[in-house]
């Protein structure tokens, strides 16, 4: 989490968020993979705690760690199965993903075992010029980005099907493993357009 007011609302000290996350992730991984867990850490006191049913995936579901700053990129490389971000341009994504891979090597992990995910807003319409103002208004009023990160509304995929395909191909060429598309205002007709006019034309 990067939004300090969310932590203030629940009485959690913002600067402790990284430590709390790592503690809770370690606990979750143990509950997923061990028959029972006994430990005492901070305000947690578990005695032969059992979590059933165990996850279908073995040893556990993929853990994608999201965030922007180097501390989070290091955490993803050290503790996660991959990195998750949103609203990154191809250039911004590449810069941070290269860091994750380098950190993985630093921690003695095989970088090829990690995956990457970028979430992108998309609006398919008559032309980029026509839909861009509406997309910008939506992203600037109903979404939020960390001003000190590479997350930006400039990432937005919008325009004709041809234009959207061209913009998405630039992301695919970064080597990103997974793109999550967020249709403009979650409109069902946008989902249909993306599925029919855009996705079939993308090439890895």
Please report, for each region that a protein language model flagged, where it lies by residue:
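Active-site-adjacent structural elements that line small-molecule/cofactor binding pockets in enzymes
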Residues: 1-204
């Amino acid at each position: 989490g990067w939004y300090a007011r969310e932590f203030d609302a629940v009485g959690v000290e913002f600067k402790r968020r990284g430590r709390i996350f790592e503690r809770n992730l370690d606990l979750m991984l143990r509950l997923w993979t061990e028959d029972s867990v006994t430990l005492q850490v901070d305000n947690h006191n578990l005695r032969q705690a059992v979590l059933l049913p165990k996850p279908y995936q073995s040893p556990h579901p993929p853990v994608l760690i999201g965030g922007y700053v180097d501390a989070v990129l290091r955490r993803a490389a050290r503790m996660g199965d991959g990195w998750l971000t949103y609203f990154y341009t191809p250039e911004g994504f590449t810069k941070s993903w290269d860091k994750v891979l380098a950190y993985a090597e630093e921690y003695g992990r095989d970088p090829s075992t990690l995956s990457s995910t970028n979430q992108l807003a998309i609006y398919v319409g008559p032309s980029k010029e026509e839909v861009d103002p509406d997309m910008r208004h939506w992203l600037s009023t109903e979404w939020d980005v960390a001003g000190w990160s590479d997350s930006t509304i400039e990432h937005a995929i919008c325009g004709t099907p041809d234009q959207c395909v061209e913009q998405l191909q630039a992301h695919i060429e970064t080597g990103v493993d997974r793109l999550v598309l967020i249709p403009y205002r979650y409109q069902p007709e946008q989902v249909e357009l993306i599925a029919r006019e855009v996705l079939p034309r993308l090439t890895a």
